[in-house]
Amino acid sequence: MNDKQKKPQKLKARLPRGFVDRTAGDIRAVNEMTAKIREVYEHYGFDPLETPLFEYTDALGKFLPDSDRPNEGVFSLQDDDEQWMSLRYDLTAPLARHVAENFNEIQLPYRTYRAGYVFRNEKPGPGRFRQFMQFDADTVGAPGVQADAEMCMMMADTLEALGIKRGDYVIRVNNRKVLDGVLEAIGLGGDDKAGQRLNVLRAIDKLDKFGPEGVALLLGPGRKDESGDFTKGAGLDKEQIDKVLFFVGITDYGESAVRLAELVAGTARGGEGVEELNFIGALVTSAGYGPDRIKIDPSVVRGLEYYTGPVYEAELTFDVTNEKGEKVVFGSVGGGGRYDGLVSRFMGQPVPATGFSIGVSRLMTALKNLGKLGASEVIEPVLVTVMDGDVEAMGRYQKMTQELRAAGIRAEMFQGNWKKFGNQLKYADRRGCPVAIIQGGDERATSVVQIKDLIEGKRLSGEIEDNASWREARVAQETAPEADLVAKVREILAAQAEDRKRAAYGFALPYDPAQVGDTDENA
């Protein structure tokens, strides 16, 4: 086969594994949700901050597995100056870098929120993506646990602002210092036990996955999974295991507080942690946040390896059906805690900090389950059709389109092949356009337009069976002077809105055509 006979190979359109395209509905739903979150954060006095998607890899701290080839866990590339850069793994490490780099200009305590995508170079799976959005809030430079208490209250207020009612969520609070006290009390204090302490932390982090029995094996000799793979345990004896399981198994802090205080009584750090938990509990209760909203709960174990003090988690308590058809509690949608060591990595001096992160995609799934998201109405644009292609006619069509837009009405002029008018109406139907504007030569000569109610027209064609019904129905197409274009379109859109409300609520609601397209919230 010669070169002339060879067909060029078509490039295959492929979405990279672990990534998703976001369509208009999802984008609008996220925007609706994040606007409500942002409003709560602003009311608490937090200010926005934006950091780049890339950071120097060494700024990511514990996520740097290999200084020569840092490509595990993060997406990395080497700059032209041979320095490694990585897509951010979370929003906290970039904040720490920003604070350290601008420490002399920042007013402490520094209260900030950030929203954006983070990236994980991990094996993708169902519901597990390599790019996802987080929404964080942090206070840097506030050493007192009142800052942690405020974070918990802000998390509760955020969930309620999104429509999640009390009883369907709880903010659970624990303290890393209490666990440190427990570990010291069972003989795992000191630098020489650091490795064993780390194994204990990793074991109890699996509590949700393996339950108390599985964690007991990981705390002791080790655990073999279904495939036969063996995970070596932390090597604790039965008495040590029982004390650790008592701590992470506490469900009623009030009933267990005395015994817990006795367990850590000989450790300064453990006693301090218990005092901090009690202080947080007293603060939130005084502010009107009872245990139905914010609960001291030592069973919160996620992130204890990372945090240095209080740790908190937002959990949704209602049931959903999983992929297997089983009823399960929805679970965590965000969490955080105190991380006093992260900023100080750059500073060489202690810089206290606390904050939390909301998993936007997971929370959006929860809100859709509750019917709290995506209900806001998005009206497709009015379509100004094109009957003639000369400059004068095109100018008129564009002028009409701009008049509608200036009045706050979504509008577009048809940009396809205008010579086949039927295709324009097909486009309008598939697009879901509520109204079409038509002006041919005859209409242009008398300065009028045809205004076609596409929603009513579709209903009439499907429902009306006799002439009497037709006469009683709303007019689906009418002629109007060009000067009345905006007013007539508003009138039709208002009538359509009333029809939608009547269909949704079962009764007619009054409407004011003058308010359609009005962008003033106080109108």
Curated annotation (Swiss-Prot):
Subcellular compartments: Cytoplasm
GO MF assignments: ATP binding; histidine-tRNA ligase activity
EC number(s) given by UniProt: 6.1.1.21
BP GO annotations: histidyl-tRNA aminoacylation
UniProt keyword annotations, A-Z: Aminoacyl-tRNA synthetase, ATP-binding, Cytoplasm, Ligase, Nucleotide-binding, Protein biosynthesis
Catalysed reactions listed for this entry: tRNA(His) + L-histidine + ATP = L-histidyl-tRNA(His) + AMP + diphosphate + H(+)
SUPFAM superfamilies: Class II aaRS ABD-related, Class II aaRS and biotin synthetases
GO terms for cellular component: cytoplasm
Enzyme class: ligase
SS bonds (residue pairs): none
Domain of life, source organism: Bacteria
UniProt-listed PANTHER family: HISTIDINE--TRNA LIGASE (PTHR11476:SF7), HISTIDYL-TRNA SYNTHETASE (PTHR11476)
NCBIfam families in UniProt: hisS (TIGR00442)
Subunit annotation: Homodimer.
UniProt family annotation: Belongs to the class-II aminoacyl-tRNA synthetase family.
Protein name as annotated: Histidine--tRNA ligase
Organism annotation: Rhizobium johnstonii (strain DSM 114642 / LMG 32736 / 3841)
Taxonomy of the source species: Bacteria, Pseudomonadati, Pseudomonadota, Alphaproteobacteria, Hyphomicrobiales
Underlying gene: hisS
